[in-house]
Each structure stands twice: as structure tokens, then as C-alpha cells.
């Protein structure tokens, strides 16, 4: 139990990134020099919920500010929190755990909470670290709020859905928290806590930009992707009006003129997407440009024209592979011909397109990799693909890989 006379303070941390030797060899000294970087929107959502309920919150964005672990620890010491929440993807789990150990050196009484995609699947392993008090699984807003209130009041931890913790030598895995059905009930992300202006997009041309999450979940089942296993395969949407309220807030209060929708797939529902596009004009957001992820075979000329009128400037497509056997093996659910048709119609309407490609899927050969490279070239030369990015297939926790 925490002294009830004391203001409850929580510090949320996006931990330092580790720059690879390859990136360093090309002159990169921090993550913002490597690729497009976004503010930690998930932490900002949690912060918004905590602040709405009277908890004092600060947010440390170590990766984009170029902070070391020592820098982060100094800021945490200055804040003097009772709780520290650290987000972790698989690529930064070691950084997060190292930071957790350092936090406990400040004071063993600080409760350390870890969450994020890696924790969702590996919570029973991560909780065995002595420096980690709680693992939060799934959507973190309500779970973190309930957990902090429970610890503060000395309540029963087994009543908090979505957490894993240690009781002596035993690991306690509470039931999963059901997904929140009405996403409009969440507070907007606490963007006032962001350390501007460290963020940039591939298409912003120096403009301030902000990410937005308007939906959660993905109805598809790509074998390399953990998103449907974290957010569910049901596509949950905020109301159009709620999304427009947030867009208007960041447009007028923060001066943002470029939005990057971070939804796994924004355009699942055609009517909802068209209503959103038309609503932007009705709200007077005439010079607000934006980008989103699309899906091959899901867009139509009608939808793309509405998106173009609403100032959509680029759509990111997960094309992945140029070989039909590999596409089928990873359960993408579309054909090479559909790829060409989708890129062609996007270009014809006047929206730029970016293709995500991968290499190294199980059973791939030199020939299938060449198929992918050749498809990317063909799309650029003959169908209007504007840009492409290539990555190596990685078997992340929670995926069939």
C-alpha cells in the first residue's frame, strides 16, 4: 500500500534503442537517423487514461531524444515516482530489462510494470526477472489504471484482469482482459507529454506530424504478423466523429498538418472510411495531409478518389513477396495480379504508394527472392509504385513463424 496522502506518480518510458553495427557503419548515431520514427502512441494512450483519473504522469521518449540509460535514470530519479511503466518490443526487450534493473537500484520500492507486444506473449518468462513487478498483457489503458489503484490501496491483485505477477516463487497469470468494445471511451493520447519536434515521417517534408490510431484489430491472418493475436481479428472502430474530434484537436492545438494513421488496416469498412474522408473537409481541415496502410485487393477506385479528395498523399501496402507460392504460404490472401491492379489504380487516382517487401521466408530460394526484386522493379517502372522498403523475415513471438 502507498501513502494515500502522497500524489500517485507514474513515469512511462519508451526505452533506448540499440543501433546496429550496420547502421553505425553508415554514420547513424541515433534511431532518428535510421528510419521513420513515431512517438510512443501506446504510452500516450495509457498516460491519457491515467491523467484523466487523477494520476500524475510523465513520459520519457528515450529513443527519439537519443537518451542513454543513464539519462533516463536521472530523469526518473528527478520525478520520484512510485510506478515506472516500460514498453517493450522484441528488439528492445534487453534494453527494457536493463532499465528495469536500474530503476530498482534507485529504490526497490518503485513498482516496475512492463508491457507491449513482446510482454504480451512472453510474460511468463519476463516476470521471472527480479526487477519486474508486473507484466501487462493486451490493451494497457484500463489494466494499468486498475493495477495502480489496486497497489495504491492495497487491494487484491488477483482481481486485475490482464496482469502477470509473482507471489513468492509462484507465477500468477490472471485472466485476459476482454477487449474494450467502445473505443470512444478512451481518453485521447496525452500528446502534451511528447517531446516535440523529434518526429519525422518519410513524406512530411519537414512538417510537424503526429500518429493517430482510429481502429484496432485486423481480420486477416498473415503468418508473420502478431497484430491479430494482440488486438484480435475483429476490426474495432472508433466513431467517425470521435476520430475527427482528435484530428481537429491536433490540427488546431498542436499545429500538425500531417497525420500518419497507424491502424493495422484503416480501410476495412468502406462506408466508415468515406465518411471519415468527407468529415475532414466538413471540419475545415483542408490542408491536413495524411497517410495510412492499405491492403492489396481491398481498395476501389471510388474509395481511392474519396481519399485523394481528403488529402491522402500516400498509402503503404504490404506486398511482401513477388512469388505466388510464398504469398500463399504466408497466408496473404491475394495474387500477384491483384498487386499490379492495386498499385496501378492508386497511381492513376494520384495517390503515392509505398510497397513493403520481405526476404527470407521459410522455403525461399534465390529464385523466389529474385521474383520479389523483379516485382518491385516492375511495379515501379510500369505501374506507378513510388517507393519500396525491404526487410528480413523475423520470427517474432506470437506468430506462426
Predicted regions and their residues:
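Residue-level recognition of beta-strand->loop/alpha-helix junctions
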Residues: 14, 59-66, 87, 229, ...
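Catalytic cores of alpha/beta
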Residues: 125-128, 303, 363-378
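Glycine-rich beta-alpha loop elements in corrinoid/cobalamin-binding modules
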Residues: 42-182, 398
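Hydrophobic anchor at the start of a short beta-strand
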Residues: 10, 56-58, 112, 290, ...
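Short catalytic helix/loop segments, enriched in acidic residues and glycine
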Residues: 28-47
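Flexible glycine/acidic-rich beta-alpha junction loops that bind and position SAM and/or redox cofactors
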Residues: 19-23, 168, 220, 270-271, ...
Amino acid at each position: 500500500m502507498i501513502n494515500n496522502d502522497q500524489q500517485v506518480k507514474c513515469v512511462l518510458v519508451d526505452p533506448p534503442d540499440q543501433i546496429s553495427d550496420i547502421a553505425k557503419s553508415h554514420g547513424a548515431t541515433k534511431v532518428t537517423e535510421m528510419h521513420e520514427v513515431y512517438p510512443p502512441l501506446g504510452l500516450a494512450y495509457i498516460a491519457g487514461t491515467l491523467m484523466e483519473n487523477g494520476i500524475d504522469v510523465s513520459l520519457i521518449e528515450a529513443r527519439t531524444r537519443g537518451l542513454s540509460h543513464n539519462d533516463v535514470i536521472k530523469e526518473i530519479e528527478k520525478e520520484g515516482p512510485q510506478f515506472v511503466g516500460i514498453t517493450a518490443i522484441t528488439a528492445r526487450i534487453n534494453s527494457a530489462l536493463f532499465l528495469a534493473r536500474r530503476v530498482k537500484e534507485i529504490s526497490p520500492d518503485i513498482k516496475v510494470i512492463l508491457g507491449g507486444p513482446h510482454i504480451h506473449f512472453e510474460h511468463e518468462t519476463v516476470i521471472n526477472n527480479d526487477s519486474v513487478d508486473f507484466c501487462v498483457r493486451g490493451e494497457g489503458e484500463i489494466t494499468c489504471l486498475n493495477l495502480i489503484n489496486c497497489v495504491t490501496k492495497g487491494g487484491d491483485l488477483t482481481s486485475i484482469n490482464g496482469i502477470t505477477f509473482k507471489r513468492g516463487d509462484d507465477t500468477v497469470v490472471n485472466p485476459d482482459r476482454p477487449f474494450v468494445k467502445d473505443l470512444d471511451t478512451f481518453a485521447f493520447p496525452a500528446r502534451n507529454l511528447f517531446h516535440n519536434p523529434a518526429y519525422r515521417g518519410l513524406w512530411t517534408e519537414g512538417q510537424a506530424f503526429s500518429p493517430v490510431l482510429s481502429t484496432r484489430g485486423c481480420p486477416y491472418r498473415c503468418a508473420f504478423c502478431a497484430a491479430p493475436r494482440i488486438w484480435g481479428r475483429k476490426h474495432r472502430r472508433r466513431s467517425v466523429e470521435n476520430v475527427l474530434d482528435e484530428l481537429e484537436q491536433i490540427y488546431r492545438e498542436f499545429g500538425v498538418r500531417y497525420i500518419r494513421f497507424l491502424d493495422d488496416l484503416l480501410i476495412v469498412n468502406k462506408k466508415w472510411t468515406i465518411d471519415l474522408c468527407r468529415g475532414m473537409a466538413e471540419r475545415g481541415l483542408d490542408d491536413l495531409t495524411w497517410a495510412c496502410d492499405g491492403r492489396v485487393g481491398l481498395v476501389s477506385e471510388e474509395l481511392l478518389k474519396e481519399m485523394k479528395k481528403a488529402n491522402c498523399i500516400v498509402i503503404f501496402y504490404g506486398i511482401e513477396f513477388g512469388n505466388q507460392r510464398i504469398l500463399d504460404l504466408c497466408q496473404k490472401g491475394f495474387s500477384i495480379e491483384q498487386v499490379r491492379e492495386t498499385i496501378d489504380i492508386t497511381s492513376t487516382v494520384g495517390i503515392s504508394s509505398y510497397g513493403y517487401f520481405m526476404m527470407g521466408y521459410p522455403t525461399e530460394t534465390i529464385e523466389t527472392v529474385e521474383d520479389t526484386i523483379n516485382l518491385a522493379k516492375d511495379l515501379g517502372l510500369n505501374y506507378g509504385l513510388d517507393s519500396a522498403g525491404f526487410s528480413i523475415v523475423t520470427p517474432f513471438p506470437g506468430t506462426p513463424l
